[in-house]
């Protein structure tokens, strides 16, 4: 509402603040880490969904990924980012109802890479090619999604049927339709780890499972350009011999642009590395209950409970903490308001936290929180608004 | 994407379906229930956020509320609904940074009623009136929010300081600025009840606490036009003597338009009363793990865990169930995809659930789920798309 004014205290609340230099620094650090290991970063766009931060993920030439390949979580994101990026990986196994749109996007850029983990995905793409012979001008560009132990998506690399899919598109009857790019895994189970050591071990495990399967495919004579692993926790604890020992040549983190309370609790970032805050206003105070009420509820913060498995039983309910006063936490988000209590029951300073005071909330899960907003207010280190980024929305 | 086609199977997924006759019937039944008790329904708009369903909430003249008074959860909603409704209650204690916008809205319709539960709310409204003497043409219309035991917002009716606030605006130095409309409570703790009997008892408790305070104010000589209680669970189990015994003359439910899995688990509706489903596509299948993967994740369903306190320890993870096959449930939503398992571990029928098959998901919490979408596809009893409703978004 007050975009002409650069003072965040005049913003309509709830709204989201993006800390520009923090986000840029997160991007640079991830790129430097990967470059030191000799691997590409194929950054995921899903956390921020903005062209501007997508560019930050390649800034200063620290990213070895010269094709500026990116990953998106929806086809809507794919179309949105195609204005700037021409090598896009759509990271969900392709459903038949998305084949047509995916192929149109593929034709419009260098390549839209799509995922398969079942023969039905291949069949529906072949079916499209056969039914649209005039339109089918270039092969589908595909990655095999493999399950590295997360058990959400991906084919089992131990099964012969998985390798049979690769054979089918490389040497078999489907070879005229497909360009095989490589393999991809996602270690989402890293968010359930207890300690940084657990994450480190999981990183080794993902590198081994995915890397070994890449080696196996190569030993069978297949060309495997890309062996890609990831999740922000694993990408924060990569083994030094990722490329030399395991043959993994790409990582694909996403959340690291913003980080959040979960990444902090897992030990993957410091509080000052968190690049997104929700600005809220205290709408009432209840000194008799030692509580505040703010105008940011589930529709501003999301209702993700975060890493409850890492918390003391007394502080399980923690849907965000207050920036610069991390003893204060969101304990109960309703749709449009949330209750704030102090974790250790110490008295809240009501001379500081008054009706009308602004607070900044560090979210549990920045991917979900950022997605709640249509505009990001981008601020500098002096808390002045320097830009507005508009994320892609919906599907 | 295929709005010209009335077949839901051609819709881009994920998307939301609104079951027109179910929603209308929910509205009629709530109005009939209230009318039989002789009380108004002041319907809440926050669950659906659409003008069309707002009108359904007054259809067939079953609602005794002749001023067509409604409730909204944000000022953005207030402005949106002011096109159709002229008596609006903004249900969050008014923060100083929202006073100006609230007063503009108040001037533009019959009345915007705002909430107070602390003297600071009154002070900021008086401050605005004093600083804008030419603009201040009509008194602020206000409700006192009282705490009926939920302990989220509201002044304590047992404290003299609460009644002092009423005195201040009715007879005291602030009387030139305010029109006192009545009192309002919200029994959000009804969502933590174990059984319908518990909810019934809570309804009596809210009616007693709020109704008694209304009687007290009247006995002190104050005019109290409205004594309003609510929450969909409580409004589903109202005592027959709500008006005659307790003096409560208004209820303000919202979720009842759509209902959801939580309301079903609490015993407030049947599965067939749930008026909103998320349509999703199966993007992959994993027979070896007896699992499906669908393209509706936390950004389509929300990550609200629902009424975990009512569930068997084995089925705590339930972020939505499959319509017409309620043994299948969302066990793990990620940002854009979710895993589905069968609750009793029985084998999923993979001849029915194939890659590309559509499923309809009954959400845990319809208020949060509906808010994830920019368009509602409205369907009739034959599952044909008959309309598109566009909800108010953001703040």
From Swiss-Prot, chains A, B:
Keywords: Detoxification, Lyase, Metal-binding, Pyridoxal phosphate, Zinc. InterPro entries: Ala_racemase_N, D-amino_acid_metab_enzyme, D-ser_dehydrat-like_dom, D-ser_dehydrat-like_sf, PLP-binding_barrel. Zn(2+) binds at residues 365, 367. One of its GO terms (molecular function) is D-serine ammonia-lyase activity. Its EC number is 4.3.1.18. It comes from Dictyostelium discoideum (Social amoeba). It catalyses: D-serine = pyruvate + NH4(+). The lineage of its organism: Eukaryota, Amoebozoa, Evosea, Eumycetozoa, Dictyostelia. It is an enzyme of class 4 (lyase). This is D-serine dehydratase.
């Amino acid at each position: 509402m007050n975009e002409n004014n650069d003072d965040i205290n005049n913003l309509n609340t709830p709204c989201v603040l993006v800390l520009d230099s923090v986000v840029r620094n997160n991007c640079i650090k991830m790129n430097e880490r990967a470059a030191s290991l000799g691997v590409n970063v194929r950054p995921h766009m899903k956390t921020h969904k903005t062209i501007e931060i997508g560019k930050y993920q390649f800034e200063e030439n620290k990213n070895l990924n010269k094709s500026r390949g990116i990953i998106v979580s929806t086809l809507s994101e794919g179309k949105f980012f195609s204005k700037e990026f021409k090598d896009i990986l759509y990271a969900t196994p392709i459903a038949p109802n998305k084949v047509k749109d995916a192929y149109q996007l593929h034709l419009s850029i260098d390549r839209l890479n799509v995922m398969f983990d079942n023969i039905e995905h291949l069949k529906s793409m072949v079916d499209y090619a056969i039914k649209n012979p005039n339109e089918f001008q270039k092969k589908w560009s595909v990655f095999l999604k493999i399950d590295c132990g997360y058990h959400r998506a991906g084919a089992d690399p131990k099964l012969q049927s998985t390798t049979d899919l690769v054979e089918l598109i490389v040497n078999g009857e489907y070879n005229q339709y497909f360009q095989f790019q490589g393999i991809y895994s996602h270690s989402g189970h890293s968010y359930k780890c207890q300690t940084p050591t657990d994450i480190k071990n999981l990183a080794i495990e993902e590198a081994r499972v995915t890397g070994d399967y890449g080696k196996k495919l190569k030993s069978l004579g297949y060309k495997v350009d890309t062996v890609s692993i990831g999740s922000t926790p694993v990408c924060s604890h990569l083994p030094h011999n990722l490329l030399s020992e395991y043959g993994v040549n790409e990582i694909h983190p996403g959340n690291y642009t913003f980080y959040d309370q979960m990444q902090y609790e897992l030990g993957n970032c410091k509080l000052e590395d968190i690049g997104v805050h929700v600005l809220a206003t205290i709408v009432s105070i209840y000194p008799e209950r030692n509580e505040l009420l703010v105008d940011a509820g589930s529709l501003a913060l999301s209702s993700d409970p975060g890493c409850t498995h890492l918390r003391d039983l007394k502080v399980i309910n923690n849907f965000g903490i207050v920036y610069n006063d991390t003893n204060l936490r969101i304990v109960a988000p309703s749709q449009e308001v949330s209750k704030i209590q102090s974790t250790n029951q110490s008295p809240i300073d009501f001379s500081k936290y008054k009706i009308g005071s602004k607070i900044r909330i560090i979210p549990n899960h920045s991917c979900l929180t950022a997605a709640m907003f249509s505009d990001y207010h981008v601020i500098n280190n002096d808390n002045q608004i320097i830009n507005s980024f508009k994320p892609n929305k919906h599907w």
